[in-house]
UniProtKB/Swiss-Prot annotation:
Family: Belongs to the universal ribosomal protein uL18 family.
SUPFAM superfamilies: Translational machinery components (SSF53137)
Organism: Streptococcus suis (strain 05ZYH33)
GO biological process: one example: translation
Annotated Gene Ontology cellular component terms: cytosolic large ribosomal subunit
UniProtKB keywords: Ribonucleoprotein, Ribosomal protein, RNA-binding, rRNA-binding
Assembly behavior: Part of the 50S ribosomal subunit; part of the 5S rRNA/L5/L18/L25 subcomplex. Contacts the 5S and 23S rRNAs.
Any GO MF annotation of the entry: structural constituent of ribosome
Name of the protein in its database record: Large ribosomal subunit protein uL18
Top-level taxon of origin: Bacteria
Pfam families: Ribosomal_L18p
Organism lineage: Bacteria, Bacillati, Bacillota, Bacilli, Lactobacillales
Entry's transmembrane regions: none
Length: 121
C-alpha cells in the first residue's frame, strides 16, 4: 500500500489568493494599484493604471539606489523610491495590492515606507 504525502506549494496557494483578490481590486488613473512582487532575492513595486494598462511608477532592488543592507532594509528603500516617483507624477492615493503575500516582514516594511513618503492607502 503506497501512501503519498504531498506538501502544499506555497507559491501556488499565493497565486490563487492573488487571483481571487485581483477580481475585486483594480487600479484607475485617479487611484492606481500599488503592486508588490517578492522573490527570494529582491522585491519589486509598481504603480499600475489597470484601465489603460500602463505602469506609472516603479522601483525595485535592481535600482542603483538600492544595494546595501538586509532584504527588509532594501524593501524600506524600495517603498520610499516608489512613493517619491509616484508623488512626482502627481499620484498621492493608491490601492494596495500585496500580491497574495501576508502583510508581514518585507511587504509590511515596503508599505509603511511608502505611506511615510506620501502615498495614501
Amino acid at each position: 500500500m503506497n501512501i503519498v504525502i504531498s506538501k502544499p506549494d506555497k507559491n501556488k496557494i499565493r497565486q490563487k489568493r492573488h487571483r481571487r483578490v485581483r477580481g475585486k481590486i483594480s487600479g484607475t488613473a485617479a487611484r492606481p494599484r500599488l503592486n508588490i512582487f517578492r522573490s527570494n532575492t529582491g522585491i519589486y513595486a509598481q504603480v499600475i493604471d489597470d484601465v489603460a494598462g500602463v505602469t506609472l511608477a516603479s522601483a525595485s532592488t535592481l535600482d542603483k539606489e538600492v544595494s546595501k543592507g538586509t532584504k527588509t532594509e532594501q524593501a524600506v528603500v524600495v517603498g520610499k523610491l516608489v512613493a517619491e516617483r509616484a508623488v512626482a507624477k502627481g499620484i498621492s492615493e493608491v490601492v494596495f495590492d500585496r500580491g497574495g503575500y501576508l502583510y508581514h516582514g518585507r511587504v509590511k516594511a515596503l508599505a509603511e515606507s511608502a505611506r511615510e513618503n506620501g502615498l495614501k492607502f
